[in-house]
């Protein structure tokens, strides 16, 4: 079928909304009418080249929610009319990682940047006569998509789509970074550095886990104000102010758990994050840097002598088929504030405006809300 999609044709160029053609669902595939897509910083990394796909053009978008319209042969766990969320990490449940309980590290994830279908290695989307590389096997910046069932999670149909799409990446990643990867325990002091969608979700995770103090570090003033509404106890504009403030509040003990959720991770900043990490504490690097950045500034002696831990994480260490429904059930129960994380809704044609707003610090999370005009 022919529809629209937001593409990039080369690095550092605006998104181009234009006609694309999507194939019909094959074995184990699901066709979805998209209703909402989250505008995550990781898609901007496609533009800058910090996270390059295997080729161009690229169809962006890896957070999304919609309605199943058609299923391919062999699909018996989804049916037309189902409300679903797209998980940016596929999960087969069968590979060694999935069997070991690390479904966020599923072997199917090896193809996240390759653009080839999990089903048969083909390209299922074309534009201007060329194969299109969809972000993380999805490409939610289009009002329709065909995707392998391993990336699809059924949800409660009463959950608004603009909220549901956030748990496909940002909310699950942030919340899981706190409660699972950092393993925040009651009474822990926690610092969150960077307050976009992932950071605000990590903040809520720390509060939910029973943190004593939650220190939020963010240069944008209105985001610091929002952090207080989400449960932060102290806010600081930068890491130097946080160093002094956290030292004063904790009598020099610092934060047992530090979670880094800045827009782009820079190796030169890692040592500064460890200065606010307590002895024996853990610094979780949730943010991602350039795939070619191999330089890290780190005081190795202090890392050893103070027994500090640096831990990477993807998808918050979670299981998409478990965590996505669980987090949405918490939202329904009033235990997770997702409504206030959606700052602005955009049309697909406004995607460049949305990303400029993100870069200007105006959004916690922008969302593309699809209409009939987009289709």
Swiss-Prot record:
> Which CDD domains would you find in this protein's record?
Zn_ADH_class_III
Recorded coiled-coil stretches: none
Q: Which GO terms describe its molecular function?
A: alcohol dehydrogenase (NAD+) activity; S-(hydroxymethyl)glutathione dehydrogenase [NAD(P)+] activity; zinc ion binding
Keywords recorded for this protein, A-Z: Cytoplasm, Metal-binding, NAD, Oxidoreductase, Zinc
Q: Which PROSITE patterns match?
A: ADH_ZINC
Residues holding Zn(2+) 2 = 92, 95, 98, 106
Where is it localised?
Answer: Cytoplasm
Biological process terms in GO annotation: formaldehyde catabolic process
NCBIfam families noted in UniProt: Rxyl_3153
Give the similarity note. Answer: Belongs to the zinc-containing alcohol dehydrogenase family.
Q: What is this protein called?
A: Alcohol dehydrogenase B
Q: Which organism is it from?
A: Mycobacterium tuberculosis (strain ATCC 25618 / H37Rv)
């Amino acid at each position: 079928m022919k529809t629209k999609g937001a593409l990039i044709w080369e690095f550092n160029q605006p998104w181009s909304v234009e006609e694309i053609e999507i194939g019909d669902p094959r074995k184990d595939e699901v066709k979805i009418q998209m209703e909402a897509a989250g505008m995550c910083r990781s898609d901007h990394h496609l533009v800058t080249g910090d996270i390059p796909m295997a080729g161009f053009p690229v169809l962006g978008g890896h957070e999304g929610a919609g309605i199943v319209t058609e299923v391919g042969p062999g699909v018996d766990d989804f049916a037309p009319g189902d409300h679903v969320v797209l998980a940016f990490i596929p999960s087969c449940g069968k590979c060694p990682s999935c069997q070991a309980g690390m479904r966020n590290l599923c072997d199917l994830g090896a193809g996240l940047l390759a653009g080839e279908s999990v089903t048969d290695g083909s390209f299922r989307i074309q534009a201007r006569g060329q194969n299109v590389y969809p972000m993380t096997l999805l490409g939610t910046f289009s009002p329709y998509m065909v995707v392998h069932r391993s990336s699809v999670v059924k949800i409660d149909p009463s959950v608004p789509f603009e909220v549901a799409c956030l748990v496909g990446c940002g909310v699950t990643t942030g919340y899981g970074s706190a409660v699972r990867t950092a393993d925040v325990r009651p009474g822990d002091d926690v610092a969150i550095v960077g307050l976009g969608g992932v950071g605000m979700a990590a903040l809520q995770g720390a509060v939910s886990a029973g943190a004593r103090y939650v220190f939020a570090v963010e240069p944008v003033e209105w985001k610091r104000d929002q952090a207080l509404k989400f449960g932060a106890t102290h806010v600081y504009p930068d890491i130097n102010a946080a160093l002094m403030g956290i030292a004063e509040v904790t009598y020099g003990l610092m934060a047992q758990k530090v979670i880094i959720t800045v827009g782009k991770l820079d190796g030169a900043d890692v040592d500064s994050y460890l200065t606010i990490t307590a002895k024996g504490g853990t610094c979780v690097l949730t943010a991602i840097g350039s795939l070619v950045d191999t330089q890290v500034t780190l005081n190795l002696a202090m890392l050893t002598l103070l027994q500090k831990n640096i831990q990477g994480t993807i998808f918050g260490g979670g299981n998409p088929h478990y965590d996505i429904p669980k987090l949405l059930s918490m939202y329904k129960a009033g235990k997770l504030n997702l409504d206030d994380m959606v700052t602005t809704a955009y049309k697909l044609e406004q995607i460049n405006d949305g990303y400029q707003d993100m870069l200007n610090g105006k959004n916690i999370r922008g969302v593309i809300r699809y209409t009939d005009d987009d289709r």
